[in-house]
């Protein structure tokens, strides 16, 4: 090894030891011919001092991010010069030998100056990601990720799981998003697809008798750009045979408890649960943030006989802002703009005066009886503001759910040190395909219905006989885990019987021919004693970003993509040469298409 110690691990117990350190030059200070340098390696920082004239003369040439090796004696810092903010802050190294391992060019941004971190644009950071990762916070993010990986593996190996790698070159099968396609050079005109998840392969592993599988899996989805999404991402993927929902949930909670402990947090299990219907009714979201206690109150029945046209709608709901009646008019107007940015016409409101009198546009348009009872109905007290949404149920609840979060932010109700986990269970098995498309998802099949989770999720046992007769009422045997308003994992008990799987395909408008072509290998496998099985997949990037307190999942990915799936570091995606295009066979016609075209041409010539 080129060094004997790590810089950040030097302590008073090392005083009088001769040490060799390696690392990068951080901050440098010159004091009357004596040079002080913060030497940084993966463990942290140590102060090294150049006092001897010859070595100090050479140290004058050192600049930020030079890679160096130093040898010297560990000494106690002079009294009063200790740095309590550094683990090594009680000592320094008096350098006797200096070796420059490599020089550094002028930096595109400062690395050791935390005050400048927010001034560096993300494109620049990602273009020079290898420098960005030298920052303590960014390097620590990847080390935290490694610890989380190890913690999950520890739990799974304790339960006799087998880590298995599944293919990353497979066939294109519809799973809810667009596939990334890879041309197959040896079979011109055909393509592999990068997997959106290991879903089908892990189910086949259950058929194969592996019983307990896991994988830290890379997944790929060619989606339109959305905030804080990545075209390639990581899942902790887990599957088990001969289990029910309770077994999977218990294991998932054990994994999360162990992972959270790596960051020094203790979480209490079992986690609370709520149904999907309750989550939407009370919080306007299937991933509610439960760190604050604001709930939506349904007012549809209350206003069933109203003369106010705005409230003569399918749904009316409300949320209360504590003390919100004191907001100035400009703030109330800002709420209207906020709602319009979310596709709503506005956000109706009533102000409850300190004397209990109601004011605002809505108060003037509702009946005396409605004015007399609305505050009690929604739980508002003098000084509060009641915000309303009216319209179709789904979008109105979504608006109120967003308002709920905005109110909590404005009132400072969100405790960033708190972890609020909940399971959301009993989600619908199917949703209208039009709704899925409106949200930017790919609706599989050619039906009015598409799967909410995926096509391989089993219905709850009580809907097994009826889900294809009444798809809108069927509930999925599925469970999502939510933390602080973020969905961090989701799973289900899977279909393991061929006839049930074929019935699901029929509901989704996937013909027998298409099912056979795209999923025949899975249907065939179900014919050979497939066991009952289920599992869960955790969004690993999201979990690590939450653990580390990062604003974006990009901070916990070594080399992430920026907006639109572009990699500023390598400038990917890039064009290919004409030779590469020809060799890949990307423009070749598949044999079936070519044969069909030839047949059509022959027929037309007769």
Swiss-Prot record:
GO terms for molecular function: aspartate-tRNA ligase activity; aspartate-tRNA(Asn) ligase activity; ATP binding; nucleic acid binding. Aspartyl-tRNA synthetase with relaxed tRNA specificity since it is able to aspartylate not only its cognate tRNA(Asp) but also tRNA(Asn). Reaction proceeds in two steps: L-aspartate is first activated by ATP to form Asp-AMP and then transferred to the acceptor end of tRNA(Asp/Asn). Residues 578-590 have a biased composition (Basic and acidic residues). Residues 199-202 are annotated as: Aspartate. L-aspartate binds at residues 175, 221, 453, 494. The gene is aspS. It catalyses: tRNA(Asx) + L-aspartate + ATP = L-aspartyl-tRNA(Asx) + AMP + diphosphate. ATP binds at residues 221-223, 230, 487, 539-542. It comes from Corynebacterium urealyticum (strain ATCC 43042 / DSM 7109). This is Aspartate--tRNA(Asp/Asn) ligase. SUPFAM superfamilies: Class II aaRS and biotin synthetases, GAD domain-like, Nucleic acid-binding proteins. Residues 593-606 have a biased composition (Low complexity). GO terms for biological process: aspartyl-tRNA aminoacylation. The lineage of its organism: Bacteria, Bacillati, Actinomycetota, Actinomycetes, Mycobacteriales. Its EC number is 6.1.1.23. Homodimer.
């Amino acid at each position: 090894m080129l060094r004997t110690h790590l810089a950040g691990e030097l302590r008073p117990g090392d005083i009088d030891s001769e040490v060799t350190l390696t690392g990068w030059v951080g901050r440098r200070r010159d004091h009357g011919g004596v040079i002080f340098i913060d030497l940084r390696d993966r463990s942290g920082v140590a102060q090294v001092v150049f006092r001897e004239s010859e070595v100090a003369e050479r140290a004058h040439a050192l600049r930020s991010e030079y890679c160096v090796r130093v040898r010297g004696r560990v000494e106690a810092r002079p009294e009063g010069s200790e740095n309590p903010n550094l683990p090594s802050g009680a000592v320094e190294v008096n350098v006797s030998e200096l070796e420059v391992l490599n020089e550094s060019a002028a930096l595109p941004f400062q690395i050791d100056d935390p005050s400048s971190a927010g001034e560096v644009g993300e494109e620049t950071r990602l273009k020079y990601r290898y420098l960005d990762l030298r920052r303590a916070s960014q390097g620590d993010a990847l080390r935290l990720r490694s610890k989380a990986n190890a913690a999950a593996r520890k739990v799974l190996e304790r339960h006799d799981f087998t880590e298995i790698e599944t293919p990353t070159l497979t066939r294109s099968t519809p799973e809810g998003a667009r596939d990334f396609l890879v041309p197959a050079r040896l079979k011109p005109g055909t393509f592999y697809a990068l997997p959106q998840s290991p879903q089908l392969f892990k189910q086949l592993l259950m058929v194969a008798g592996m019983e307990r599988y896991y994988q830290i899996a890379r997944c790929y989805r060619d989606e339109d750009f959305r905030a804080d999404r990545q075209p390639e991402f990581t899942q902790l993927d887990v599957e088990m045979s001969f289990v029910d929902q309770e077994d999977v949930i218990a294991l998932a909670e054990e994994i999360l408890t162990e992972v959270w402990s790596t960051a020094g947090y203790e979480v209490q299990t079992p986690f609370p649960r709520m149904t999907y219907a309750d989550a939407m009714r009370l919080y306007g979201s299937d991933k509610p943030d439960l760190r604050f206690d604001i709930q939506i109150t349904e007012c549809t029945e209350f206003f069933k006989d109203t003369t106010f046209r705005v409230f003569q709608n399918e749904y009316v709901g409300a949320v209360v802002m504590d003390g919100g009646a004191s907001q100035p008019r400009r703030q109330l107007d800002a709420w209207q703009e906020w709602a319009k940015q979310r596709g709503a016409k506005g956000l109706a409101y009533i102000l409850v005066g300190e004397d209990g009198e109601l004011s605002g546009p809505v108060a003037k348009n509702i009946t005396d009886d409605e004015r007399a009872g609305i505050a009690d109905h929604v739980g508002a007290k003098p000084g509060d503001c009641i915000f309303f949404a009216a319209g179709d149920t789904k979008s109105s609840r979504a608006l109120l759910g967003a308002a709920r979060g905005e109110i909590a932010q404005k009132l400072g109700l969100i405790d960033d040190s708190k972890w609020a986990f909940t399971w959301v269970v009993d989600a619908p098995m199917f949703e209208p395909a039009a709704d899925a498309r409106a949200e930017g998802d790919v609706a599989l099949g050619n039906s009015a219905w598409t799967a909410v989770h995926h096509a391989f999720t089993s219905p709850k046992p009580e809907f097994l006989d009826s889900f294809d007769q009444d798809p809108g009422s069927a509930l999925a045997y599925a469970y999502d885990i939510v933390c602080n308003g973020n969905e961090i994992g989701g799973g289900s008990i899977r279909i393991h019987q061929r006839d049930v799987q074929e019935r699901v395909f029929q509901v989704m408008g996937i013909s027998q021919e298409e099912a056979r072509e795209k999923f025949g290998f899975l249907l065939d496998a179900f014919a050979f004693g497939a066991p009952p099985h289920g599992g869960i997949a955790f969004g690993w990037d999201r979990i690590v970003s939450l653990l580390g307190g990062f604003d974006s999942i990009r901070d916990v990915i070594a080399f992430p993509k920026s907006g639109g799936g572009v990699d500023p570091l390598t400038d990917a995606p890039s064009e290919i040469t004409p030779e590469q295009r020809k060799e890949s066979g990307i423009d070749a016609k598949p044999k079936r298409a070519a044969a069909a075209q030839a047949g059509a041409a022959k027929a037309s010539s007769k």
